Each structure stands twice: as C-alpha cells, then as structure tokens.
Design a protein with these regions (language model features):
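Intrinsically disordered, low-complexity segments enriched in small residues
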Residues: 3, 16, 21-265
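Bacterial N-terminal signal peptides
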Residues: 9-16
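Extended charged/polar low-complexity repeat regions
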Residues: 215-216, 220-225, 234, 256, ...
Length: 828
C-alpha cells in the first residue's frame, strides 16, 4: 500500500463510507486410522496455594488475630469485611512470614520488640503438634509435586507490660504448606492414558464428540478450517472469537488481540488466549522427543524429532528449531511462521521472548520475576511488557491470583479486565469507560449445563445490548450462532459426523458439507445446495493429493480448476489450470498459471499465464532483496514490458517507487522519522518509523508533521501549505477533521458505529442501527430520512424515503430466493 494512504487511511475511510459423556479410549494406531493425530503431554500443574498454620489451638482470640491479619473485622463472633477468598493472604510464598508476623502481633497484643522470625525449609516432616501433617513432604503425583510443607519456624517478640519491655521473648511456632492441583488439562482424559516404561503417565487431548465407537479421545482431531456463522467450525464444533483491544499503526505495530476458543482447556478455567501467549511445550516421550507449538489462536502443532530435525505433520509448513548451547543443553526455541516469515524466539521454558518481522523489526517480551512489585504481578513468569522496535510499549498488571487486570497502551490509556469466580473473563472496560461483557454456560444455550465449563454463550456490546448468542450441545460442540433478533442465525447438525454435517442458514436453507480424512486431517470435499428459482440442486467438489494439497476444485456451476503440480518440499503450487468443464475438458476460457518461487520466502518470482493452446499471454516477474522486499516488478504482455523499481530503508519501508514510464520521470519518494526521533506534537514516540514526507513525480511535497502515541497522523501539510488537523477519541476513531479552519465532526456509538457526521456549515447526516449492528436509517438535518427494512440474512427488503413532514415519497422493495439471490425488485 502507498505509505501516504496507509497513514491517512482511517480518515479517508470515514469520509468515503457512511456506513455425550466420555469417549471410548482407543490406541494411537487406531486414532490415526480414524483420522486423528494422537497428541499427549504430561499432567499440568496448577497455581500454588499457600497456607500458614500457628501452633495455638482453637481460641477466639486466635480467630480474631487471623481475621484481622486478612483485613477483616471481628464482630459478634464473626469475621466480616473480608476481600474475595481468591485474594486472601498468603497470595504468594513471600507472604507466608509476613502473615505469620501479623497473626502473632494481633494475638499477643502490643510488642516493644519484634516480631522476628526464623527461616523455614521445604520438605521437612512434621510429625506432631496442632499443625502436623499425614507425612513428610513433598507429595508427588506422576512425579510432580502436589503438596509440601515446611519445618516449624518461630516468630518471637517482647511484649509491653506496665510500660516496661518484657525481659524475655514470647514465641509461637508456625509451619507453612503449599498445594496445587496436578492433573490432565481440563477436557483431557483424567486417567493418564499413556504410560511408556518408566516415563510418567501422560495425558491425552480429550476432544469429545457425540459418536461411538469411532472416537479418538486422545487425538488432536485436526480439520480444514471452514468456518460458518460468527464463527464456528462445522466439523469440529469449535467456537472461535477474535476481539481486538488495541491496534497500533506503522511497521510491525503493537497489537493486543484476544482469542476465545471453546476447546482450550487449562486448570484455572481460562478460555482466552492473546497474540503474545504462544508457547512451546517439550517432552521426551520414551525415545521420541516431541515438542508442541501452542499457537495464540488456539491451535497446537506437534513436532517429532527424527534424529536431526523436529518435523510436523505433512500439512504444516511452519518450522520449529531447538536451540542448544555448546554442551547440547536446551537454551530455547525458534518458530518460523513460513507464510509471513515471522520469527518467534522462546526461552528454555517455552515462553515467547521476541517476535521478529521479515524486515528485521523486533518486538521484545518481558516477564515478571520474584523482584517485580506486587502492584504489577504477585508471581514470576507473567507477561508484563511488550516493547516494539521503536520503543513503544504495552504494559500489563495482574491480580493476586495471576489474572490479567490491566493493560496500558502506548498513550498511557488503561484497559481493565474483570472475571467471575471461575476466573472466566467477563468484562473488558475500554479507555472510553465502555464495557464489553461475556456470558458463559447460560441456560438454554449450553445443553450440558455447567459442563464443559467456560462455554461462551453470549456477548453484550458496548451499547449495553446483547449482540451475539452461541449454542452448544451436551458435549460442548458449538452448533449455532446468531446475532440479536436471530439475525444471521446458522445452525449445524452433527448427525452424520464426521463424514458430513448439515448447515442451516437464517433463511432456512440447508446445505450439506462432506469431509475426507487424510493424514490425520479432515478436509472439506464438497457442499450441496438445494434447488431454487427454477435451478436444480447443485454441489461443489474438491479432491486432495500428496501432503493434503488440493488437486481439484469445482464450483456450483460446474466450473473446474485443476491443480497440476506442487513443490512438495514447501507445499507451494507451481501450476494450475482454470476454466475447465466439470469433466475437466478445456474451453476457450481455459488458462494455465505457472509459478516459480523465491528460494527462501513464500514469494513468487515468476508467474506465467497461458491460454488453452499453451500460448503465453502474460508474465509477471519479481526480484527481491535479502528481506524479501520486491526490488523490481516487470509485466510483459503482447510483446510490451513495463517495469516498476523500488528501494527500501532499513525498516523495510518504501523509499522510492520508480514507475514504468521511460519518457518522463515518474518517481515517488518517501522519507521517514528516525527510529530514535523525539517527535513534535502530542507523543514523543508516535512518529518513529512513520512517514515524514511524500514527494510525487512533479516534486510536490506532502508532510505529516505530527503523530499521536498510536502512530496516527495528527497534522498533514499538503504541497500548498494547507494543514489538515485530525483528532481521535480514546478508541482511535476519527472525531474531527479540520482543513484550513473548516471542521467536519464525527460521532460514534459505543461499538464504534458512525452515528453522525456534521459538516463545516452545520448540516449533518445521522445514522441509526439495530441491535445486530445493521444500518436501519439515515436522517439529514432537515428531517429527510431513508429507512431500511432488513431480513434475517441482512438483505434490504424495503427502502422507504420520507420528507421533512414524514410523508412517504418513494418505496423500493426486493425479494430474495432460497439461496439468498435477488429475484425481484419493484419501484412502485
């Protein structure tokens, strides 16, 4: 995209557009036979819960001391005013001794010296006393520590008596304990299915589908991505919801994107990941080392060591590399997302530490340590900061049990995250104080009731209106999505799973989707549709070949494309033929496209287009620099060639574009603010790496004089010296555009829908929407209006124009058939 268009795109866009039960267990070979790819891992360890015990006994005074140490008030034999139980002390191990000291001081009254405490050691048996345990620690489950206790440690202090500091210490013995759940991730089979020799028992990924006996409870049942509705995957029953809280601008921008996935299972009940939550998990399964790349979007890919490399399933192109020191010890991992050539680096524990773009721009991730202030995080290992290549930051804080509490964007604005008692995300409060709420396992929408937990059943938007609903069957498979008023309702029936499913749209039209299992992946092989408006039933078709690459695709009209060849080492298409008959015969419209590819990047270097006779019609050739940026692009057709030439800066941003003309100079030039620039205007870092000037072929210069902290332009000066000033709201929406003293204002509702545009002369247009976020009316300042009636599919079935006296002046009606195609329009 032209860099100038990139920086002013938001303004331009606004101006141009107004708006069940457990499955049968089978072995690994059966799993693969039935289309799954067995993925297993060790039990998951939950968060430690700490406790401190004083050797006192049951005394009211001791109960009062404990109550006060927790921040409560003792009244009428009860402790009141306590914080929620998940926030009770001790939140971390570091709070054990301070809590014991507080209890001691509250119990013994005023002290003139102390309290003082001796140290403690984990793993010591306590065999007597009021704080005794059943046995010495630690207690292990499958080799993982589940419980441990400390030796007695002593808290002492001198009491003040009669104004005199006591001669001897008063003492009290305490012990501490820590416990955590050790089990398979929620949703996995809890019986630890796989045991290999002396290797600790392993968990199996428990996808639960309502079919028997062909059920792979320990399979990562992978399927082709084909989403319907808002959205769900019809074959897997996966509900996936992407919510973008923050999006910066410029090269390799900061972004905070949350992803809900109903089949993410972790011990604390969370169902949301974010774009910085990818991780690597490594296990030695007997003699076969295996690593899992858990992606931010909810998918997990397994990589098996073949003696020299970690190799994924044949349909996965992304690369995983183990990093070691000179002695062969694991130091980290690198994951290459091949499509974008983005390189992710992980530490030895599998935490994501950096993300580097193809141009070499890096975002760095920082995590909490034992020395991190409690106001930021109470425990180590939590993401607290992401810093981009230019110094802009996202900062995060957490509550006492490790849940993300706030995010601060580069402008210093704060986003708040709220949770229910199951630690499920229930509310996000944005910088404009608007709330977006999430509902789970609601009656009538989750057939299994509270199981599986964490099923997203509804979203209430920032207008405080319920916008979306999702329904699940008794085993947690999503089968229906709809917007407010049953708009865009899509219902999936899994009765013939996994060979086919049926999908019913909001019009009641039923389509059947069929699937084929290949290399552990279910691939869509076709969709049928019913007859409509005199046209008979029809179906699409698809077939697949080596490495699950598509070999043929046919649309509803019988038009066919053959995929002739691939570079199978990289799964890159090298030849396809389009415009064939249903049987594969050539037609006058037939053409073949042949592609050659860059040796490193998934970028074409030569595209050749031929007609049905094999005659070359056009070629497009590209050369690239070492970062994959296009240096030259040449199009040759009819014996004529045109060439564009590009240059770039160190950030991969375009410096010059030299067009194809040779008779005149047609070079456009761009300059950028330095990576270390301290910028004029509202934000010191906002302009870094952003466009500073654009000079066209005639030498006319447009400059962007100011940027905000998000990288959005605030002041644009055109070649005539005329300045355009732009103002945004806290959600980065354009609210004002002043050009030479003439101001246009924009207003939005809570979800960001444009409500009103007021022009410099005071005239305006206002926009009205329904609860499903669809435009239903446009009104001008004189009172003229256009009203839209929409069906459940979003089609405008009626348009009515009213004048200032509310008199109907014109009506337009439309009728749509079963397949949602317009068949009738009337202008009475």
């Amino acid at each position: 995209m032209n860099p100038l268009m990139r920086v002013i795109g938001l303004a331009a866009a606004i101006l141009l557009f107004a708006p069940a039960g457990h499955a049968q267990t089978i072995n690994r070979s059966q799993c693969i036979q039935y289309g799954g790819n067995a993925i297993c891992w060790g039990p998951v360890q939950g968060r430690w819960k700490h406790a401190v015990c004083g050797e006192v006994g049951s005394f009211t005074s001791w109960s009062i001391a404990q109550c006060q140490a927790q921040g409560g008030t003792w009244a009428n034999g009860n402790c009141t005013g306590l914080p929620p139980q998940e926030l009770w002390r001790p939140a971390t191990e570091g709070d054990l001794v301070p809590l014991a000291k507080d209890q001691f001081s509250n119990f013994h009254g005023p002290l003139c010296d102390g309290p003082n405490a001796t140290g403690y050691t984990w793993g010591v048996a306590i065999s007597s006393g009021l704080c005794s345990t059943a046995g010495p620690g630690p207690v292990l489950v499958q080799g993982y520590e589940q419980h441990n206790n400390t030796n007695f440690f002593t808290v002492s202090g001198k009491k003040l008596s009669g104004g005199v500091c006591g001669p001897a210490d008063t003492t009290l013995n305490f012990s501490a304990s820590r416990d955590r759940p050790v089990q398979c991730p929620g949703g996995d089979d809890q019986s630890f299915l796989f045991t290999t020799g002396s290797t600790p028992a392993l968990c199996s990924l428990g996808f639960r589908y309502p079919i028997t006996p062909r059920q792979c409870s320990e399979c990562d049942a992978k399927f082709a991505n084909q989403q319907v509705g808002n959205p769900i995957d019809p074959i897997t029953g996966v509900k996936r919801q992407v919510e973008v809280d923050y999006a910066g601008s410029g090269p390799h921008p900061l972004r905070f994107e949350r992803v809900y996935h109903n089949r993410i299972y972790v011990l604390d009940g969370k169902k949301w990941r974010h774009n910085y939550s990818a991780r690597i998990e490594f296990h030695n399964f007997g003699t076969v080392p295996t690593a899992f790349a858990h992606r931010a979007g909810g998918r997990s890919y397994s990589y098996t060591f073949n003696g020299s490399l970690f190799v994924p399933n044949v349909d996965i192109d992304d690369k995983l590399t183990k990093l070691t020191d000179a002695g062969g010890a694991l130091t980290g991992w690198q994951f290459l997302e091949v499509a974008s050539h983005t390189l992710e680096t992980y530490d030895a524990a599998g935490k994501l530490v950096s993300i580097t773009s193809r141009a070499g721009l890096t975002q760095t991730l920082e995590y909490s340590t034992v020395s991190t202030p409690p106001a930021v995080a109470h425990e180590p290992g939590l993401l607290i900061r992401v810093t981009d290549h230019f110094g802009r930051q996202l900062n995060f804080t957490y509550d006492a049990i490790g849940r993300m509490a706030t995010m601060q964007d580069p402008a210093g604005q704060t986003y708040l995250y709220g949770y229910n008692s199951q630690s499920l995300l229930t509310k996000v409060t944005y910088p404009d104080s608007k709330d977006r709420e999430y509902l789970y396992n609601e009656a009538g929408l989750a057939a299994g009731g509270a199981w599986p937990p964490g099923l997203l059943t509804g979203i209430q938007d920032e207008n405080n209106v319920r916008f979306a609903s999702y329904s699940y069957d008794s085993v947690g498979m999503a089968y229906r999505t709809e917007h407010a008023g049953v708009v865009n309702r899509v219902t999936v029936s899994h009765g013939s799973w996994p060979s086919s499913v049926t999908v019913t749209d909001a019009r009641g039209t039923v389509r059947t989707h069929t699937y084929q299992s290949l290399n552990g992946v279910y691939l869509n092989t076709g969709v049928t549709q019913p007859a409509a408006n005199g046209v008979g039933t029809a179906a699409t078709a698809a077939t697949y070949g080596t490495n699950n690459n598509i070999s043929m695709r046919r649309d509803f009209n019988g038009n066919r494309t053959n995929y002739n060849s691939y570079d199978l080492t990289r799964n890159l298409e090298t030849s396809r033929t389009e415009g064939l008959t249903s049987a594969g015969a050539t037609t006058p419209a037939t053409r073949t496209i042949e592609s050659q590819w860059h040796a490193t990047f998934r970028l074409p270097t030569l595209i050749t287009e031929k007609n049905s006779a094999g005659t070359v019609l056009r070629t497009t050739s590209m050369t690239h620099d070492s970062n994959g940026n296009v240096l030259t692009r040449t199009i040759t057709a009819g014996g004529n060639s045109r060439t564009w030439t590009y240059t770039y800066d160190a950030n991969g941003a375009v410096l010059t574009v030299d067009g194809p003309r040779t008779d005149v100079t047609d070079v456009t030039t761009y300059t950028y603010y330095a990576n270390s620039a301290t910028c004029p205007g509202a934000a010191a870092l906002g302009c870094r790496g952003q466009v500073e000037t654009v000079t066209n072929a005639a030498g006319h210069v447009t400059s962007i004089a100011e940027y905000d902290a998000h990288g959005r332009p605030l002041a644009i000066v055109d070649p005539n010296g005329l300045t355009t000033d732009l103002v945004y709201d806290p959600r980065q929406r354009l609210t004002s555009r002043n050009v030479g003293g003439e101001t246009t204002d924009y207003e939005y509702d809570g979800v960001g829908q444009l409500k009103k545009v007021t022009l410099p002369d005071g005239s305006f247009l206002s926009y009205t929407y329904d609860a499903a976020h669809r435009l239903t009316q446009v009104t001008d300042n004189a009172g003229n209006r256009i009203a839209y009636t929409l069906d459940a599919m979003g089609n405008r079935t009626k348009e009515e124009v009213f004048d200032t006296t509310n008199t109907l002046k014109r009506t337009l009606t439309r009728v749509y058939e079963t397949l949602n195609r317009l068949i009738y329009e009337a202008h009475p």
